[in-house]
Regions:
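S-adenosyl-L-methionine
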Residues: 1-20, 33, 51, 55-84
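Class I S-adenosyl-L-methionine
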Residues: 2-4, 100-274
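Conserved S-adenosyl-L-methionine
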Residues: 24-25
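Conserved SAM-binding loop of SAM-dependent methyltransferases across substrates and taxa
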Residues: 28-41
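Short helix-capping segments at alpha-helix termini
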Residues: 39-40, 62-67, 108-111
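Conserved SAM-binding motif I beta-strand of class I
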Residues: 43-48
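Short SAM/SAH-binding signature in class I
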Residues: 85-93
């Protein structure tokens, strides 16, 4: 049986058993092969825009004796897909901008799937924004660390509400904390309440980091956030050491202050209030 990377295995775990998948950007069809070998799915449609990867996918399917259960198709995004051919759409291994363009190119096709399993390599906020505009709710999400990088894997369902953090409960938890507890956490009650009560803050962090990941206080997200926060503070401190910073440096410092403040507030919420 073929072995999957941690990220691909997380994607596989999100697929509803018995659902035929349409794997866009299938690369070598490893995901399709594993799901078929496990009998998780009855059949699959593997599509890729490049002939090379599709040819390798066909070879892998032949070697595993699964070519009859997985159709391969040359397609730019969902251009070669017909509505109703699959219940689950899987897109992974590409940037968020390209993924969002595929999802928005033909809304009828995108919304015809019962579920979407998506794992952008970058700019996940663009994918989350695209889903929100299309009325496709994120119902589950995992953060995966692989080879020193962090990836999100999200499950979304057309017409379903997006699972979001209970910010009201977060504020209630802050109200229940003593001044000593808040001091040990490095925050001031009024200040942290104002930040976490802000709708722009909530919308921003949910888009950037994932509403489900925040709601579940995902341990991998915490690790990712702490690493990113440390990196930004380091850059900010180096800029502060400049004796005569120019306009570009001052602008960068202002941006970093905002980013660091938001990240610190979210880190507090994840570690103490969610």
């Amino acid at each position: 049986m073929i072995n999957l990377s941690k990220r691909l295995q997380t994607i596989a775990d999100f697929v509803t058993p018995g659902s035929r998948i349409c794997d866009v950007g299938c690369d070598h069809a490893y995901l399709d092969i594993r799901l078929l070998q496990q009998e998780t799915i009855p059949s699959a449609l593997a599509m890729d825009v490049a002939p090379g990867p599709l040819s390798i996918a066909q070879q892998n399917l032949m070697l595993t004796g699964l070519l009859g259960r997985c159709e391969t198709r040359l397609s730019d995004g969902l251009a070669g897909y017909k509505k109703g051919e699959a219940g689950t759409l899987v897109i992974a291994g590409m940037g968020g901008r390209l993924m969002a363009s595929i999802l928005s190119a033909d809304p009828d096709k995108t919304e015809s799937f019962r579920e979407l399993i998506l794992s952008p390599q970058s700019e996940p906020w663009l994918v989350r924004g695209c889903l929100s505009l299309s009325g496709i709710g994120i119902t589950d999400e995992k953060c995966v660390e692989e080879d020193g990088k962090y990836y999100c894997v999200m499950k979304a369902v057309p017409g379903a509400p997006c699972i979001r953090p209970d910010w009201g409960a977060v504020l209630q938890r802050i109200d229940e904390m003593s001044d000593e507890e808040l001091s040990q956490a490095g925050v001031e009650r009024g200040s942290i309440r104002r930040i976490l009560s802000s709708e722009p803050f909530r919308a921003g962090v949910e888009a950037e980091y994932g509403p489900c990941l925040i709601k579940n206080a995902d341990p991998c997200l915490k690790k990712q956030l702490l690493g990113a926060l440390k990196s930004r503070i380091s850059v900010y401190n180096k800029l502060c050491e400049q004796t005569d910073p120019g306009v570009a440096a001052k602008t960068r410092m202002q941006v970093l202050r905002g980013e660091i403040g938001r990240m610190q507030a979210l880190t507090f919420a994840l570690c103490y209030a969610i």
